[in-house]
């Protein structure tokens, strides 16, 4: 039969690119699991009462090329003015070698959070370098491997200050009046739920206030003034007040380290180390503290440890502080951070080194001095005598100045009374300074850049003598070695090849949805139309962003069954927090602010109780029955018991046990009956899209992990995006913003992120995914994700019991393999299997979550049958190896599993094991072998001997 033109156009071509198994392979797998079709399989698994009759109408699929052209036209509506707004965001020059070899490299951006250190040594080293940069610049003892943004870091500093404070009865937190307004906004939001009083005043008045447990100062104020807080910090320390200082990475290259002045905590944004503004993000925040407070720090910390052979190896240290272990008692609810962006900043520092960074910082400061000198020479007054890169210039006719700036396509900071703010950066040139003279003075000013340069070079007093850094920075060899592009390229490649990412193998992590991050989806994030916009530019300059965000929001509304979407939360955990705050504010608006009980199933992800605690709620755990489902009797009993104070339930769907619970609507009804709201965690949305939806099920609010279901890559541990969908009654209570009015969101609530749309520059990834898949493609993706999981479960169930199943013995989009019977019988643990999988070329599934002693497998729809079979074959081969241990062929203390993973050097070392070298390192054959660079890590050693800065180069050799 002759094909039609529509068939030849093949507008749904991307669907076949995204979904791994082709039609024939899907049929083979359907036959294997005993289902006639994808629709039949879905019909068997998903409860009938929550199945959608038709997929949400988000349009037909578009080809990669058509979608890129459409988005390019939208991006073209953004106006790329030169922004001198500052406020924590500046233009940057991302070195092309880092752009090409990291930001555009799937070997870096498709990796997962380094919970499995043996396959993560490359990015762990890059993160350790980031920590070293932080330690050197802040002058403190301990640093984390990034937080979500500067404002969030400020809120974390406040929470940490309270945790470590010896002033247990103090309940007030002081914020200096010249911190960035978005920082204050987020701090106030967090303080409200913690019950802290926030005092905002001039820093020199802090000693007038009583019952203060912590203080937040900003070394370079929001309008540019450099503060020497040494004496004030000493006085505060004498009163046992915890002092936090917000700082700027580039300024710290020249300025005295706050840690040297006695600060307890120092934080800020690493954005200006090579990361584009991107209309607000993503950007990595840095965070450092004194050694005595290390166990109270938020976020990931990379530490140096030893492997089983005694070699130096890196790992995430002190994980017992974190949400996946401590749950509601965790220091923070942080799960995803900003690893990819921290690594860009880290490698920016490596590439430029201390000499290059000082040259950049001094150039910025010199140009600022030249601008200041010229303006003062012509009679304009500066608000501050001491500055690094930002001037606050008093102007008589502000409207005229701003009009000239607009005509020259320049953005100045305009929210300062009778003045404008001007922040220079590494992209600023002498020509830019000359243009600024024209804007501020008119064209006939007669100033000469060369003459001004000579004057300020001889006599610059804009940085106080006592605030000039007098110690060396970045003395470690890693920052003084890789300064040619050839050396830098090879260094980055040497790190990349130590790691296992999606460009090499399936990453079957349950609850993580490690699916394809298509090249066409990634291309727009580096377009200058998206990358170069300041988040606080006038809204008419960001019409392309607003159109893209509006379309994406509309699609997500339809896919979730909600009425509105808020794009501000820049991680899943932050989305949880924002959603719970919306619930709290809703109850408060009804004079029911006392409702603070959050019901959480025993199987929940650790972020759920941690977020509930952060939102000021009390957690009450609901039991699960023997089949892993929410125990309805226990739910009813606890909902009724706490009826007067019931705020909400947090439930994941499909459940964290990997099944579609039949009673999910009844769960919603019970909670609503007793006055509560239903928070449906969107972690498993990849098994809902096009099949059902949270709103249709009966939920009131959800966060969506765009870095799972909607294809934003995990980046080795971030970035992520966690927008929330809400029903209409909660829409007035989603986060707002103090700097930018968010169009379409009638909200007066405080912010949870520094930027109004969170990490806006990665939203084009999800826009592209939905546009290229269309309604039918999205549904098919969910169905194939379910098929792939059931295929794995069906083929492995005889070797490894599948712990939980739904109707007809089916699972949802992931399955839990129960290793406990094997461990009891043979002594081989889930950890041994996880590490042995590395020898077979696989990242381990999720270990011991949500049930200890298990492995949770989520293949996603992007993996083809060949890769699924390779994983299944590896698991079956490992089961055969376990049987060898059981039979006594290999002793329990010396076999390929307990010694896994095996590294290359073992091939030429003395061999005393009862199994061969070939069995050790080539269990799946020699083709395309992945080589880990370290053996199994010693976690106990790493935490007992905590060391979180760069080690000698010789330790890597």
Curated annotation (Swiss-Prot):
Catalytic activity field: N(6)-[(R)-lipoyl]-L-lysyl-[glycine-cleavage complex H protein] + glycine + H(+) = N(6)-[(R)-S(8)-aminomethyldihydrolipoyl]-L-lysyl-[glycine-cleavage complex H protein] + CO2
Superkingdom of this protein's organism: Bacteria
GO CC terms: cytosol; glycine cleavage complex
Keyword Oxidoreductase: yes
EC number: 1.4.4.2
UniProt-listed Pfam families: GcvP2_C, GDC-P
Coiled coil ranges: none
Entry-annotated residues carrying N6-(pyridoxal phosphate)lysine: 708
Cofactor: pyridoxal 5'-phosphate
Family annotation (InterPro entries): GcvP (IPR003437), GDC-P_C (IPR049316), GDC-P_N (IPR049315), GDC_P (IPR020581), PyrdxlP-dep_Trfase (IPR015424), PyrdxlP-dep_Trfase_major (IPR015421), PyrdxlP-dep_Trfase_small (IPR015422)
Keyword Flavoprotein: no
Principal EC category: oxidoreductase
Alphabetical UniProt keywords: Oxidoreductase, Pyridoxal phosphate
GO biological process, one term: glycine decarboxylation via glycine cleavage system
GO molecular function: glycine binding; glycine dehydrogenase (decarboxylating) activity; pyridoxal phosphate binding
Function of the protein: The glycine cleavage system catalyzes the degradation of glycine. The P protein binds the alpha-amino group of glycine through its pyridoxal phosphate cofactor; CO(2) is released and the remaining methylamine moiety is then transferred to the lipoamide cofactor of the H protein.
HAMAP family assigned to the protein according to its UniProt record, in alphabetical order: GcvP (MF_00711)
Family to which this protein belongs: Belongs to the GcvP family.
Assembly mode: The glycine cleavage system is composed of four proteins: P, T, L and H.
Protein name: Glycine dehydrogenase (decarboxylating)
Organism: Salmonella typhi
Lineage: Bacteria, Pseudomonadati, Pseudomonadota, Gammaproteobacteria, Enterobacterales
Gene name of the record: gcvP
